[in-house]
Amino acid sequence: HTQRRRQRQMCIRDRDVYKEISDIFPFHASISAEVVGETAEEMLDMAEDLIDIGPNITIKVPCTPQGLKACKELSEDEVNVNVTLIFSAAQAILASKAGATYVSPFVGRVFDQSFDGIGLIEEISDIFATHGAKTQVLAASIRECYQVAQAFKVGADICTIPSKVFEKMFTHVLTDKGLEIFDKDWKKLQSELGTT
């Protein structure tokens, strides 16, 4: 009971954060609000506290039998669900069949185990396309810029990326060099026209 009480307190604290994010970005398509619990009932109890925050709240559950049971119930009530901790195509299939709006394969963590994280995104995307699944593939645990491009190339619908990767996506040595050349040419032109 102590753990359940602690989980409930965390959920209330997280609820305030999710509410604040939802208020700042009211038209954002989806904000994933994670629930925890050992049983589907515990997850559903926490989800109930989060659903009414706004229409852009998506309930995030783990890819476990109890998480998929909660996913099934939530999706039947037309609540968007993100099934997370996906490490195989088989798990993604189960989540999709349970009504998941999104599945979140963990690209970086798959690579950590010497498997092909991008290959996993491609396999899931191909299976979903073949069967006309409505579930979207959300590539998670992205750690490098190239993984973003590759994930989208092989069929990811969405990528969640840390801010350091997002910032690196803007940077390229040739862009910096090009800006230096433009600046130098502009100063030269101003000098020639006598406008400096």
Feature-to-residue mapping (PLM):
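Single conserved hydrophobic/aromatic residue that forms the stacking wall/gate
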Residues: 1-12
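Glycine-rich phosphate-binding active-site loops on the catalytic face of alpha/beta enzymes
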Residues: 9, 85, 102-113, 156-175
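Catalytic beta/alpha-barrel core
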Residues: 9, 32-39, 56-65, 80-93, ...
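Acidic (Asp/Glu)-rich catalytic clusters
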Residues: 15-28, 48-53, 96-99, 153
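Alpha-helix-loop-beta-strand connector modules within alpha/beta enzyme cores
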Residues: 15-31, 68-79, 117-137, 183-193
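Catalytic cores of alpha/beta
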Residues: 42-46, 70, 88-98, 143-157
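Glycine-enriched alpha-helix->loop->beta-strand junction motifs that scaffold or abut catalytic
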Residues: 53-57, 73-82, 97-104, 153-159
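C-terminal alpha-helical cap/extension of soluble enzyme domains
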Residues: 128-196
